[in-house]
Amino acid sequence: MKIYVIYNYGQYNHLIHRTLRDLGVETKLVENTTPVEQLKDVDGLVIGGGPSLDRTGNCELYLKELDVPMIGICLGHQLMAKVFGGEVGKGSMGGYSEVKVRIVEDDELFEGIPREITVWASHMDEVKKLPEGFKRLAESDICKIEAMRHEKKPLYGVQWHPEVYHSQFGVELYRNFIEICKK
């Protein structure tokens, strides 16, 4: 099982890598400028967070050209929405804070996770409109699209950072993503 983490210059990308490694996955933190051809043998990708949609390198190509499960974290979630025709805009709250997220749709990504969890998130930017072919999985009082997934492909996005200590059930979420990658 090989799941790579795409480094988008986010402060928590190394924690995603460590979480996957601790869960027994062969993983590597790779630059977002890595050619698509060098990622053809992975079983899944995590598109990490970062400061700017303008600095996501080849991530759009990864989303369009690779046929593997992917999860976008924060900026990765926003990029996924944008690439597939959704809208991203300023959130009502900048900076990081604890947010209560409600899971509104059953999905294997949230298997064994309570319907309401407290997570660590920034809402400087957020997904404002779902892309066509995606469905909303979670919401909060400050953001209507905290998590989403493609209706047919194993493409997921979450606004929060499951890899940080402040987020409840983050390890479980990554464990569930690993199971999705095994299928």
Swiss-Prot record:
The reaction(s) this protein catalyses: XMP + L-glutamine + ATP + H2O = GMP + L-glutamate + AMP + diphosphate + 2 H(+)
Gene3D superfamilies: 3.40.50.880
Domain Glutamine amidotransferase type-1: 2-183
Pathway: Purine metabolism; GMP biosynthesis; GMP from XMP (L-Gln route): step 1/1
Pfam family, one: GATase
An example Gene Ontology molecular-function term: GMP synthase activity
InterPro entries in the record: Class_I_gatase-like, GATASE, GMP_synth_GATase, GMP_synthase_A
Major enzyme class: ligase
The UniProt record lists the keyword Ribonucleoprotein: no
Cellular component GO terms held in the UniProt record: cytosol
EC number per UniProt: 6.3.5.2
Superkingdom in the source lineage: Archaea
Presence of keyword Repressor: no
PANTHER family cross-referenced by the UniProt entry: GMP SYNTHASE [GLUTAMINE-HYDROLYZING] (PTHR11922:SF2), GMP SYNTHASE-RELATED (PTHR11922)
Summary of the function given for this chain in its UniProt record: Catalyzes the synthesis of GMP from XMP.
Subunit structure of this chain's protein: Heterodimer composed of a glutamine amidotransferase subunit (A) and a GMP-binding subunit (B).
Official protein name in the record: GMP synthase [glutamine-hydrolyzing] subunit A
